[in-house]
Regions:
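Short, well-ordered alpha-helical segments
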Residues: 13, 81-85, 235-238
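N-terminal cationic-hydrophobic initiation segments that often serve targeting/anchoring roles
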Residues: 88-95, 245
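Non-catalytic C-terminal interaction segments of nucleic acid-processing enzymes
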Residues: 121-313
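Conserved catalytic cores of phosphodiester-cleaving nucleases, focusing on short active-site segments
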Residues: 44-81, 85-89
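Amphipathic alpha-helical segments that form well-ordered structural scaffolds
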Residues: 18, 86, 239-243
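Nucleic-acid nuclease catalytic cores
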Residues: 92-140
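Acidic-basic catalytic patches of nuclease active cores, encompassing PD-(D/E)XK
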Residues: 1-54, 63-64, 94-98, 121-126, ...
Length: 313
């Protein structure tokens, strides 16, 4: 597998969303069958005779026309058999995706679903239940990307199965714009860069911004991301924003009084000068961030103490 500039997990989410689009470099896409992204990194509950199961898919894609959903879990090379068993409880409770507002536009009694695992690694030699489909993102630096649905773990929905394999033109970079970053260590630089660029864009266009608006602009599918993941991303964004201020952004923006540090305003007309020096500010912020994983508690940040300091607009 070729080296990646983001986490495998983040790249896979981007690829699944890209498959719902009409990417010109893809030989075929799920978008041809009407698939669209319903949710990213969310959870829902299934109650049966064994109790209540919590399921955490990475992506749910649905074709309203086909009344069929793919419930996707993005994997590395390891599988949790207990987790797979929980996913299988979905087979007799598809309507819960509609009852819990995961999916819209399909009648509860008409929806069919398929649990799907994806990975840049080959999962066909692992003990994957026959009811679960597998998609292999075969990424090679020379031949490009091929997206396989192996015969042994083929989609039961025939039109979906017939779309594969999907080939991507050699030399095309993996898509990253649909889900530009997550809370993984490999995404740290992409996260800092995206946040800074969104701050500059919003401040120059509107004169002010909130951190929620920053994330909304940075993440095209922000409204599809589960509330728990949104909270984690916001927490990291608060910390990154603090470090960008320390790196020199505070010369251009100030807190807006009465917002608890949630909203900021542009105070310098020369903010556009940062555009030519984004690498400098990103590098300075990265140097100041915790020397720990992006998904660790060391990234927790509170604006409460900061609200009593600094300048107010």
């Amino acid at each position: 597998m070729a080296s990646l500039d983001r986490s495998s997990h983040t790249h896979q989410i981007n690829l699944w969303i890209a498959l719902t689009q009409f990417e010109p470099s893809f030989s075929a896409t799920l978008g041809e069958l009407g698939y669209k992204c319903d949710v990213i990194e969310d959870q829902f509950y299934i109650t049966d005779a064994e109790g209540t199961q919590i399921i955490h898919p990475d992506v749910v894609l649905t074709s309203v026309d086909a009344e069929h959903s793919l419930v996707v879990d993005c994997k590395s090379s390891k599988l949790d058999q207990e987790q797979l068993t929980r996913y299988l409880t979905l087979n007799d409770h598809e309507e819960q995706l509609i009852v819990q507002n995961v999916i819209e536009g399909v009648s509860a009694g008409m929806l069919s679903t398929e649990v799907t695992l994806s990975s840049f690694d080959d999962l066909t030699n692992q003990d994957v239940p026959a009811e679960i489909a597998v998609v292999h993102f075969d990424h090679d630096p020379y031949s490009g990307l091929a997206i396989w649905n192996p015969d042994s773990q083929e989609f039961s929905h025939v039109p979906t199965a017939h779309l594969f394999p999907v080939n991507v033109e050699p030399g095309e970079p993996l898509p990253t714009g649909y889900y530009p970053f997550d809370i993984y260590e490999a995404d740290k630089e992409a996260m800092v860069s995206s946040i800074l660029n969104s701050i500059i864009s919003l401040a120059m266009k509107h004169g002010e911004y909130s951190l929620e608006e920053v994330l909304d602009q940075a993440h095209p599918y922000w409204d599809k991301i589960g509330t728990g993941k949104q909270a984690e991303l916001l927490e990291r964004t608060e910390r990154i924003h603090t470090e960008l201020l320390e790196a020199g952004l505070d010369e251009y923006v100030e807190k807006i009084a009465g917002t608890g540090g949630k909203e900021w305003g542009q105070v310098s007309a020369t903010l556009q000068a940062i555009q030519g020096r984004t690498d400098y500010y990103v590098d300075r912020a990265l140097d100041r961030l915790p020397q720990s994983r992006l998904d660790s508690d060391a990234w927790q940040s509170s604006t409460d103490d900061e609200d009593n300091e600094g300048n107010m607009v």
